[in-house]
Each structure stands twice: as structure tokens, then as C-alpha cells.
Regions:
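Thiamine diphosphate
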Residues: 1-175
């Protein structure tokens, strides 16, 4: 199985879960390879929430959906864009269980990508890898690098089953 096929199978597996919603940029309309994986996985449109470019608000909406009983897969096409949501990610999602003395524990799956440099580099602001930093900033969130095909489906399965939120980092050059 190729890397993209493993991603597609993972999206298909997630889409079968009743509580799952996919939220972000290019989830209903073409514009990024992550859209293609949702299409190839035949994720129903009613499970997709398209958003404009407002990353911090997207993270807040995803937290709200989680607190309302959904399991959002919040999609950030580039890791560089996820950094814009750091306020909600680091200060709210990661700390909410502690801040609420265990009353609230939102869970979501955050899907992001280190932009590919092949065949044409997108520029330094679209291909940075902040995986290690996110692990340090978010000690209560599982952060996984999807740097091998064999690890893709098990990592998404773990993210689904874990009581904690997860950040899954895909690599564009592996597509």
C-alpha cells in the first residue's frame, strides 16, 4: 500500500464513525491534496464542514463541536497554518481538562501536513515541520509523525480510540 492509499483508508475508517465530522479548508471543495483523500475515501458531504481561512476560529469551533458530542477531524492543510491556531490549541484544548477540574475534556483529531518540496518548493512559510515543538507545547495531546506508510492507519486508529486529542502530521513529499 502506498502512503496516499493508507491516508485514504484512514479517512474511510474515520468516516464510518457516527460522531466524526471533518472540518477545515478544502474539505468540500477542491484546493488541496487532503480534499482528494476525502473524495477518494467517499466521505459524505454531510460529514464535511467547509470553512474560510480563519485557523484560530476553526480550532475554537472544533473544541465546541467536541464538547457538543462530536469527534471533529480538524484539517489544517499546512502545519504552518496550524501555528495560527496555537492560542486555542495550547491554551484551551490542551489545558481544558485541568482548567475545568476534569469537568470538560474535549477530544478531536487534528490532521495537518508538512508541505512537500517536490517538484516545486512552496516557500519557507509552507513547509516547516513543528512536530517536536507541538509535542512540547501540548503535553496532554498525542502528537504523531506519519513518516512511514506502515504507521498511517495504526496512528489514525490510535487517535480514534485514545481518550486524548491527537495531532497527526502527514508529509506532502510522501504522497
Amino acid at each position: 500500500m502506498e502512503y496516499k492509499e493508507a491516508i485514504v483508508e484512514s479517512m474511510r475508517m474515520l468516516a464510518q464513525q457516527e460522531r466524526i465530522l471533518f472540518i477545515g479548508q478544502s474539505v468540500r471543495y477542491s484546493g488541496h491534496v487532503m480534499y482528494n483523500t476525502l473524495q477518494d475515501a467517499e466521505v459524505p458531504m454531510e460529514k464535511r464542514i467547509e470553512l474560510p481561512v480563519f485557523e484560530d476560529t476553526q480550532m475554537g469551533m472544533s473544541i465546541g463541536l467536541s464538547l457538543a458530542g462530536f469527534l471533529p477531524v480538524s484539517i489544517y492543510p499546512r502545519m504552518d497554518f496550524l501555528i495560527i491556531a496555537a492560542n486555542q490549541l495550547v491554551n484551551h484544548l490542551d489545558k481544558m481538562e485541568e482548567m475545568s477540574h476534569g469537568e470538560f475534556n474535549p477530544k478531536m483529531i487534528i490532521r495537518t501536513m508538512v508541505g512537500g518540496r517536490i517538484p516545486l518548493g512552496p516557500g519557507p512559510q509552507h513547509c516547516q515541520d513543528h512536530t517536536s515543538a507541538l509535542g512540547l507545547l501540548c503535553p496532554n495531546i498525542n502528537v504523531r509523525m506519519l513518516d512511514s506508510t506502515d504507521g498511517v492507519l495504526p496512528s489514525y486508529q490510535e487517535a480514534l480510540e485514545s481518550p486524548k486529542s491527537s495531532i497527526l502530521v502527514e508529509y506532502g513529499d510522501m504522497y
